[in-house]
Amino acid sequence: MFWIKTTLYQYLTQKYGQIQPPADLKAVGSPVDEAEYACPDPDTFPDDEPLKRYEEGNSMVGMKQDILYFLNPLAAEPCYYQVDLDSKAFMAYAKQIDGTPNTVLSAIMLKMVSRYFSIKKDQHISAKIADDYRKDIGCGKSYRDFVRFIHVKYDREMAEESIEKLSQRARGAILLQMQPENSFEWYRRVAEARKGIDEQPNLRSRISYAQKHSLYKSDARDTYTVSYVGRTDWGGMADYITGVYAITDGNLMLEVNALPDKICVTYQVFDRDSRPLDLFLQILQEEKLPYTVSERMVRYMPDLQLPKPKAKHNITQGTFEK
């Protein structure tokens, strides 16, 4: 995000003149502080056990869609919708029920899923919520990818509860799993996986090792995902931005960004069926939350091929070896 801001700031100032920069703007040519690429040493972490672990197992609700897509991606047409929520109204609603954007959207998605899928009595629905844990491990200024997922389990019968009650359930699960001990444990696993990748002799074997030992591959399977890691400071650039939408790869996945006047939701699905979106909007209407929504848009993901490195890259330390 740092360099997206820099590029956008360059473009806007060249076009419109001087604009108040965000506090964390990285100017072209400015020195890179060591803290910006910091990587922690897991051996320095305390060995305390977390109070809460997620051991509830996978959610089978919606898995058929995911499996069919990954078996034959060409048979589907991944798409997304831009849903804009009025920031003032949404945050007032969240405050009134003692919720957060993550917990409120998780509760709304639960109700949507319960109306969309035929859920068996013994099945449960679970939410995956992104957690930026860089501060827990002492790397608050680092722009490395320090994100893990928190899981919130709901029983089928809970879908009849109010958004307020469901939001409280989600918040309780989030608070327990956001303990620093969970972050220490997760990063130890990350460091171990990276060490294994670095030990491989060539790029092909590194890719193979990474695929077989992916931490997310062994993580719990959830019904839907909500990814909101906080409001971004755009400075004076916010006056020129009409929306911020992150496009990723996932089904029933909400990527959420915030501007001063609106919360921008990228509502992503694997196919052209509009019912998941329609039900989501229906619940917004029931809760009297104002919104606007775009037409369906095809989700094109970049197909990148990395160049062959001239030196061996150590991903654990972020360095190249001769």
Question: PLM features: what roles do these ranges have?
Answer:
Residues 35-47, 92-108, 208-224:
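Short, charge-rich amphipathic segments
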Residues 2-89, 284-322:
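Non-catalytic, low-complexity flexible loops and terminal extensions
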Residues 2, 49, 84, 88, ...:
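Generic alpha-helical secondary structure signal
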Residues 3-12, 101-113, 170, 276-288:
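Structural preference for long, well-ordered alpha-helical segments in enzyme cores
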Residues 1-32, 91-93, 185-189, 239, ...:
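Acyl-group handoff/entry surfaces in thioester-processing enzymes
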